[in-house]
Design a protein with these regions (language model features):
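Glycine-rich hexapeptide-repeat left-handed beta-helix
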Residues: 39-289
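LRR N-terminal entry segment and analogous cap-like coil->beta motifs
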Residues: 5-38, 42-44, 50
Length: 289
């Protein structure tokens, strides 16, 4: 940067460190209110940084608003998005496409946990709030992730312009799992409480996972609507499709299938283990399964 080059606005000289090549490139950008920019950080476009923000290393912030204690470091890229609150974004994380990162502590029993997005995680067109954790090689698009929910490893959260994916409470999506929204009305996957989608499992469409649900292996759950609640385990090569309710200590494994056809709802209530090549296409009569 050549001395005398016009840049953005700052409220005091301490905003820009004297070491490194950090700079605010656009004259319509502004940094104030205790913000510190250091290292080789680049601030471009009409960005606004305020309220004890710290941006360092090789961060690139473009056309974004960063505020209220956000700490951005390493090689993070933030484009066209909002980040506010005490959070940590580091590694090679990418946040773009009008994402909103809104950190808030004190809403869960873990009062000290900070919202974090790091490693090579990618967040696009999504809202990540409270104390959520996105890391590893996770990809999150068109999602609403709140509370202490986590997405990590190589997991993929794929909503669309019609329907977002919703993760809340202490839900986890990990491994190579995929959670996908559909384009039909209400085709919104919702993962609550301590439920998990792991390994190579796929959850798609109007599916609600509530208390103590684990979907793993190569299982496919495609709604809907589908409701899984109270200690349900879906694993192996098992498959659930159509309008299905499964609750109260039920395990599907091997190549088991629960499938509802148009106009019907299948209701399976445990305790039960459904395995082998077993196939259920209507609600079992009490005592027969």
């Amino acid at each position: 940067m050549i001395a005398g080059t016009a840049g953005g606005w700052i409220d005091r000289e301490t905003v820009l460190a004297q070491e490194g090549n950090c700079w605010i490139y656009d004259q319509n950008a502004i940094a104030f209110g205790g913000t510190v920019i250091s290292g080789n950080t680049r601030i471009t476009g009409t960005s606004v940084l305020w309220g004890e923000v710290y941006a360092t290393d090789n961060v690139w912030i473009d056309n974004s608003e960063i505020s209220q204690g956000a700490h951005i470091s390493d090689s993070v890229t933030i484009r066209g998005s909002l980040v506010c609150g005490q959070c940590r974004i580091f590694g090679h994380a990418l946040i773009d496409q009008h994402s909103m990162i809104v950190a808030a502590q004190g809403l869960t029993p873990d009062h000290q946990l900070l919202l974090q997005i790091y490693d090579r995680a990618r967040v696009s067109a999504s809202r990540i709030v409270h104390q959520a954790q996105i890391y590893g090689d996770a990809v999150v698009r068109y999602a609403f992730i709140e509370h202490r929910a986590e997405v990590f490893d190589f997991a993929s959260i794929e909503g669309n312009e019609e329907n977002n994916v919703w993760l809340c409470d202490c839900a986890k999506v990990c491994g190579h799992a995929q959670v996908k929204a559909g384009i039909e009305e209400d085709a919104i996957p919702t993962i609550h409480y301590s439920s998990q989608v792991a390994e190579y499992a796929i959850v798609e469409g109007n599916c609600v996972l509530k208390h103590h649900v684990l979907i793993g292996g190569n299982a496919v759950v495609r709604g809907g609507p589908i409701l899984l609640d109270e200690h349900v385990v879906i694993q192996g090569e098992s498959r659930i499709t159509g309008a299905v309710i499964i609750e109260n200590h039920v395990e599907l494994t091997d190549h088991a299938v629960v499938e509802a056809f148009d106009g019907d709802t299948v209701h399976v209530r445990g305790p039960k283990v459904i395995n082998g090549e077993e196939r259920i296409t209507r609600t079992p009569l009490a005592g027969l399964l």
